[in-house]
Amino acid sequence: MTGSDDSSVDYFREGFDDITDDEFPDATRNAVGSSPRPAKRRRRDGTASDVRRRPSENRESQRYSDGGSPQTGSDSFVVDDDEGNYDELQSPSQDSYFEDAEAPSKYKVFIPKRSNIQENIFVTQLTQPPSPPEMIRGPRWKKPEPSIARASTIPTQTIGEGRAAPNAPAASVDDYDDEDLNAAIAASLESFENEQSRPPPSNTKAPTHQPITRSPTVQNEGATDTSFLLEDIPDDAFDSDISLSPPTRAQQQPATRQFGQSSNRPLGVRQTSLFDMTSRNQTDQPPIGEQVWSPPQKDEPPTQHKLDHDALSTWVYPTNLGKTRDYQFNIAQKGLFHNLLVALPTGLGKTFIAATIMLNWFRWTESAQIIFVAPTKPLVAQQISACFGIAGIPRSQTTMLTGEAAPGIRAEEWQNKRVFFMTPQTLINDLKSGIADPKRIVLLVVDEAHRATGGYAYVEVVKFLRRYNQSFRVLALTATPGSTVESVQAVIDGLDIARVEIRTEQSLDIREYVHSRNTEVQTFKNSEEMVLCMDLLSKTLQPLVDQLRTLNAYWGRDPMMLTAFGLTKSRQQWMASDAGRNAHFGLKGKVNAIFTVLASLAHAIDLLKYHGITPFYRHLLHFQSNTEGQKGGKYQRQVVQDESFKKLINHLQPWTKNPEFIGHPKLEYLKSVVLNHFMDAGEGSNGEASDSQSSTRIMIFVHFRDSAEEVTRVLKRYEPMIRPHVFVGQSSAKGSEGMGQKTQLDIVQKFKKGTYNTIVATSIGEEGLDIGEVDLIVCYDSSASPIRMLQRMGRTGRKRAGNIVLLLMEGKEEESYIKAKDNYEKMQQMIASGSRFTFHDDISPRILPAGIRPVADKRHIDIPDENAEQSLPEPKRRGRAPKRPPKKFHMPDNVETGFTKASSLTAGPKSKAEKSRKPRTPTPEPVEIPALEEVVLTSAQQRELEQHYRNIGAASPQFIRNPRNDAFPRLQLVARPTKVVKHGSLTRRMIGTLQKMNNVGPDCGDRFKKILALESARQGDSVIPNRSPRHERRRRLSKTKPRYNHLSTSVDKETLSTEDSQLVTPEHLLSSVVKGQKQQPFYSSQRSKDDDSDDNFDPPDLATLLTRSAERNNAHKTSRFVVSDDSDD
């Protein structure tokens, strides 16, 4: 035991280094009597060896003893106050005893033995010591103060030396009054303020134990019992009575900075989250859920718009509609300072956000213009009422422009008004014609922004504005930005978007404003009538499909699987293949004709599958009517004359004439759903008239107008309970006339009032229209586009819960719906993350001056009396429209106007000083003429020239000499053949001169004498009269053409073609007479030494001939005056 005692003393000395050996027994003796630590525990029915624990358990128990939370259950131990039992203490020297034993796991799970159902408790965060933000720990329960502080009010039973008995009664909650609770709260706040000065716990070293000295004052202040906080904790959660453990008090030590905590944390603020994020201060922080945004800090030139500096200090948020929605507040604030794309589900207030932003830019600017554009006129009209009733923009400053207004009237509106509601087509026309000034526009609001792709008018408007104006804001509104990453990026690029605010129905900040929508998906199978029609049509089309298969133009076998898109792609692929390119014209015409017939009937197959037998029958009748008489092609008549086709028509005709016939199972289910809905709502129970008010409304979406008319026909049988009406677009189609915008607005108003309680709409009713409260949406056919699917479903559930019924056929239509749903959810996640998109923050201007930070001003907007007028703010028509103003060309900033030289484009602008200064030409100095001796070669230089430069190195001495003009006379009469470089004009003149010289014979003197005598006798009379003007023009044209000499051309033809005389003179006649007596040419090189007949003949020099020839040709040319400068001077 001696070794054990020595090791125990060493063990205790590690924690009490400041106590001497003499003072240690006294300190230990005093601590035993006054220590409030828990009593010793020993295991029941066990020996001392059973109570011994392994070192790991000892260290674990020491760690829990500091926090006051034992490790094992209370049922396994009994209180033992025997001071002499030292076997329960484990010495560090006994670690070797368990060295070879396998250590059990230190992780244990507490399982209460007396489990009872506890009610949910909502508590705030308890007082906690500072901890590093990267460490995540569990909750810490604070034990109550010692019971001695409340001895006068809470009696306890003790056994032994003042220790509470196990069956001591617990303190009641009723014993604590409000003063005690207030004192606890005050103490908690005081601990928060002193949090910076408290030392953080160390994770590497054991705590240093020091003597604890308590003063009565401290004990009285901390004597508040907080056991009521542990009322709902199970009784066996602790091993011993919790009232026996004293509270752990931290010692006051100098504060040290650890874990990289921020030094500028304000006092009195508690840490509520990780990484130094503190709670909000109510005095300077916005309400919970709202954010504070400021204009971005950018270095940009001042805007050209005139700003109202008094209004820039605040931005107004209207509270006319009641409660402020956090998401609308945050989105509107961000849309004021960034080019923003807002993606909100339908019915969540995109119009309110747009009206708020329009109001603030209307306040901030003095004369700038604000434009709201929407695809259709009904969408434009419904936005006007929102701006009048919510934002309070004066009606006198607002106008609605469409293409129906005259250009002169629109020009006046652009000059006088500031807020415009219009379609994008009208806007781009006014911008291009110069009626609208692009530099005055400060805000462009785009509704249904998912259309801003490709060459749509939205994209064209933004590009046009960007050319002339760099200081305007863009706000884009939509419910679904796109179905693919590429389409969303196209919208961002087309509108220069810098930020995206997207919300889904699962977003936390809009969940309380989204009403529940019960979606019911109903699938159907083909009816017996549909199967019969499919079989007969398959037999009709099978021969045509087989012909395409034999030509490898189409691979499908089942005619019922034909689609217009598939046939079009197959035709393109076959035409691009080798078989299609190499096929003869007849085969190509045959394949194209078969594809055209099958594509027309593929649409009929879709109508039969998904819409009903009646639309299918109407399409077949139209197909059959195209073959009457001589109309239609070979294969179209082959289909109509087929026996199966005739049998099909005979079956369909009596079915469609029956008014009670319903040609599709979806239509039968639709009728029952609509009837049940109105009967549950009590519609038409008292025989109401058709113009009475309706409490509930239904909207049915279809894909084709034929389907809409068929659904309306079936539902009209049950009037006045069901009062349906068709709602289609403006364009007219075969067998169906379109609806004008005025008619569309009238139907929407009647639907809101209850005149019609059911609308059967095509895609025109999907986008944007505020058609009132709809309680039931029926999608008669599925759309593979997630945009259209979401637009349809967004018509209901705006102000109360709504229902959606999807009618789908098994197979392709059901798969399309699942694909659209998955695609929508995936795209919403991608857009919200923003990691796969490129935003244009660099071209999103600040517009506001630097240093301006508008503060939110929530207030009620006073609506002007003029806004109460219900009519649209369209310009009034006049008897005589004003004259259209002349087109105005708006120039971008820093553009150079006027004309400029092409040479100055690359050199850049020159200053006037450079133009005025001309470089002075220096006077040339006379060159001194060298002496003759310095120019002439010396004898040595002459020899070097002869040997090195004129000797060609042959056996006999040969020297290079100048070309001889009399050598090779026969070859010099014609142009020698060339390969790359052709003969020049000088060469051709030289050849002509030599040819003329060759014509001179020895008897030329006698011949010319005879000619002169004959000419003097006739005195120059002409044999042939003057030529006609036509001949003269031909001769002049021939003279302008270049003359070419060829080997096959005779010398006489060359002579005749080069004559300059205009009349046929006797010389021509004589030359033609003596033509047969032509002699061989004579050359001087052929003369013999004995021939002295022409010794006196001296031929002219070659330079003289060339010079005179050039002077004669130049005499006929007209000189031109060339202007060296094209300037205005």
From Swiss-Prot:
Basic residues composition bias: residue spans: 877-889, 1028-1044
SUPFAM superfamilies the UniProt entry points to: P-loop containing nucleoside triphosphate hydrolases
Organism: Aspergillus oryzae (strain ATCC 42149 / RIB 40) (Yellow koji mold)
Keywords: ATP-binding, DNA damage, DNA repair, DNA-binding, Helicase, Hydrolase, Nucleotide-binding, Nucleus
Keyword check for Cell membrane: no
Quaternary structure and partners: Interacts with the MHF histone-fold complex to form the FANCM-MHF complex.
Segments for region (Disordered): 1-101, 124-222, 236-306, 863-930, 1018-1060, 1072-1129
Sequence positions that bind ATP: 344-351
Cellular compartment(s): Nucleus
Record lineage: Eukaryota, Fungi, Dikarya, Ascomycota, Pezizomycotina
Residue span(s) of domain Helicase C-terminal: 674-843
Described purpose of this protein according to its UniProt entry: ATP-dependent DNA helicase involved in DNA damage repair by homologous recombination and in genome maintenance. Capable of unwinding D-loops. Plays a role in limiting crossover recombinants during mitotic DNA double-strand break (DSB) repair. Component of a FANCM-MHF complex which promotes gene conversion at blocked replication forks, probably by reversal of the stalled fork.
One GO cellular component, as annotated: nucleus
Reaction equations catalysed: ATP + H2O = ADP + phosphate + H(+)
Position of sequence motif DEAH box: 447-450
Name of the protein this chain belongs to: ATP-dependent DNA helicase mph1
Highest taxon above the source species: Eukaryota
UniProt EC number: 3.6.4.12
Family per record: Belongs to the DEAD box helicase family. DEAH subfamily. FANCM sub-subfamily.
A UniProt-annotated Pfam family: ResIII
